[in-house]
Amino acid sequence: MFSAAIGYEILPTLRASVEYHFFDDKHAGMANVTLPDGTSVAKQKTLKHGTHEYLAGMEWDITKRLTVSGGFQKTNYGLSNDFQTDTSFSCDSYSLGFGARVNLTQAWSIDVAYFWTHYNKYTKETDSYNGTGLKGTDIYNRTNKVFGLSLNYKF
């Protein structure tokens, strides 16, 4: 894995950061998959490249008691038809997240957040769908929406 990040305090109450992550998935140890021609190969070898992640975020202290934040993440896995299966698939995506912290006291705070991910549909067309000799198509897709709430105590 390779990671690079930079953060900058624009104002004492406003901060921004950008990050890049690379996961060398093409050289990871994954289980074997059977290709359409019947050969077996380590699944990671079917990727076009490793995973690239691009991130950016901002945080703003509106008051001493209230902080809001927002962020973005774009993920590209380097997918191929041979990598995708009915039991294990991935989809390139982008995510947006928003949050807030309310400082109740110096020790206690409450965080609330919402995170939404849009996954790109991946269409896999084959000439012999599941070995039937007939053309077929699989469309891989998913969605992700997360709400978070926490009560924090600082020792």
Q: What is each residue range found by the language model?
A:
Residues 18-22, 70-74, 112-116:
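Transmembrane beta-barrel strands of outer-membrane/channel proteins
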Residues 2, 45, 50-54, 92-94, ...:
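Residues that define the transmembrane beta-barrel architecture of outer-membrane proteins
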Residues 28-37, 78-87, 122-130:
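Outer-membrane beta-barrel translocator domains and adjoining extracellular loop/strand segments
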Residues 13-16, 65-68, 102, 106-110:
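Repeated loop/turn-to-beta-strand initiation elements of outer-membrane beta-barrel proteins
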Residues 39-45, 81-88, 133-139:
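Extracellular loop and loop/strand-boundary signature of outer-membrane beta-barrel proteins
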Residues 2-30:
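Oxyanion-binding "anion nests"
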Residues 100-102, 108, 114, 141-155:
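Outer-membrane beta-barrel "beta-signal"
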